[in-house]
Amino acid sequence: MSYVPALKKHYKDNIIKELVSEFQYKSIMQAPKIEKIIVSMGVGDAVKNKKLLDSAVYELSQITGQRAVKTKAKKAIAGFKIRQGQEIGAKVTLRGNIMYEFLYKLINLALPRVKDFRGVNGNAFDGNGNYSFGIAEQIIFSEIDYDKIERISGLNVTIVTTALNDREGKALLSKFGMPFSN
């Protein structure tokens, strides 16, 4: 038998049953699940300093446990001196067991380390049950060594679910233990 992350086991054993009874689904297959988690980091100064972009890719890889890819500008923005196709950020798309491990680490280890943390905004859903929020400092993750980073920068986390609406999405993430402030 292979390794199953604790959150995945908790989802299959408990959360599905709770969601089916709460939303009166006819089948357990209707219960929403987390499809993927996208962690991204924009590096605006990468135009001037390529080392910052490599540092961002390395840090995202350390945080998530999966290799990050560089993202390119979709269009030119003269005000920011950005040309189309220029590398300006990094992202990681997590699925499967790595996704559940990252979510556990985020909810139980990283978010409680945020100074004056009172929960994440519960209204940041997109209308389709997907949830996005920002983290101001990457140093809340224990994998990042404060002495070795180029600069403190934030990152964005998007949790994509199969929920049909925001109410189902919020219920799903709440049962996983996401600390919503409202």
Swiss-Prot record:
The keyword rRNA-binding appears for this protein: yes
Keywords linked to the UniProt accession: Ribonucleoprotein, Ribosomal protein, RNA-binding, rRNA-binding, tRNA-binding
Functional note: This is one of the proteins that bind and probably mediate the attachment of the 5S RNA into the large ribosomal subunit, where it forms part of the central protuberance. In the 70S ribosome it contacts protein S13 of the 30S subunit (bridge B1b), connecting the 2 subunits; this bridge is implicated in subunit movement. Contacts the P site tRNA; the 5S rRNA and some of its associated proteins might help stabilize positioning of ribosome-bound tRNAs.
Assembly mode: Part of the 50S ribosomal subunit; part of the 5S rRNA/L5/L18/L25 subcomplex. Contacts the 5S rRNA and the P site tRNA. Forms a bridge to the 30S subunit in the 70S ribosome.
Keyword Hydrolase part of the UniProt annotation: no
Residues annotated as transmembrane: none
Full protein name: Large ribosomal subunit protein uL5
Alphabetized Pfam families for the sequence: Ribosomal_L5, Ribosomal_L5_C
Assigned GO CC terms: ribonucleoprotein complex; ribosome
